A protein has these predicted regions:
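N-terminal Rossmann NAD(P)H-binding glycine-rich loop of SDR-like oxidoreductase domains
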Residues: 3-24
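Active-site Tyr-X1-5-Lys
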Residues: 146-149
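NAD(P)H-binding glycine-rich loop region in Rossmannoid oxidoreductase-like domains
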Residues: 50, 57-100, 128
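Conserved glycine-rich Rossmann-like NAD(P)H-binding loop of the short-chain dehydrogenase/reductase
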Residues: 26-39
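Conserved Rossmann-fold NAD(P)-dependent oxidoreductase catalytic core, especially the SDR/UDP-sugar
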Residues: 103-144
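Residues at the starts of beta-strands that form the adenosine-phosphate
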Residues: 3, 28-29, 117
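SDR active-site strand-loop-helix element
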Residues: 7, 33, 73-77, 118-124
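Acidic helix N-cap motif at the loop->helix transition within catalytic regions
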Residues: 39-45
Length: 149
């Protein structure tokens, strides 16, 4: 039996990932962590025999408790209400985005074992500082985000 943790599991990608894992949830222990509570999604997660924990990745004790013996962590948690351009940003918003991205991720890295697989997807936003529009960006392309996200 594998222990799988999904942070940010109530977001779009997290919900889709839970759907994929729903066929395996009777054989593996799957824990979904999110700081939000969306009744419909939480009920579906529970119907799939997954455990839902309402909590924040900034809570080091909570993350340690649920990630310390995980086999796989899908780290999807992050601030999604991000400014589109720098003029829409504030220091407080940038600081929260940074704190969740850096400290929250560090909490997970500190909690997991060396044998644990961690999957951390990204988005096109890391390429937003390019000089021109590019199609077919490759994985080894230099990133140059201009916003905190």
């Amino acid at each position: 039996m594998k222990k799988i943790v999904i942070t940010g599991g109530l977001g779009y990608i997290g919900t889709e990932l839970c759907k994929i894992y729903s066929g395996y949830s009777w054989n593996d222990k799957i824990t979904v962590i999110d700081n939000r509570f969306i009744s419909e999604r939480v009920n579906q997660i529970r119907n799939w025999n997954m455990t839902f924990i309402q909590g924040d990745i900034l809570d080091k004790d909570l993350i340690n408790e649920h990630c310390k013996d995980a086999d796989i962590v899908h780290h999807l948690a992050g601030i999604t209400d991000v400014p589109r351009v720098k003029s829409e940003s504030t220091f407080e918003k940038e600081e929260l985005i940074r704190k969740v991205a850096e400290e929250g991720t560090q909490n997970i890295l500190d909690a997991i074992s060396n044998e644990c697989k961690i999957i951390m997807p990204s988005s096109h936003v890391v390429y937003e500082g390019l000089d021109s529009i590019k199609k077919n960006i490759k994985e080894d392309e230099k990133t140059c985000p201009s916003l905190a996200y």
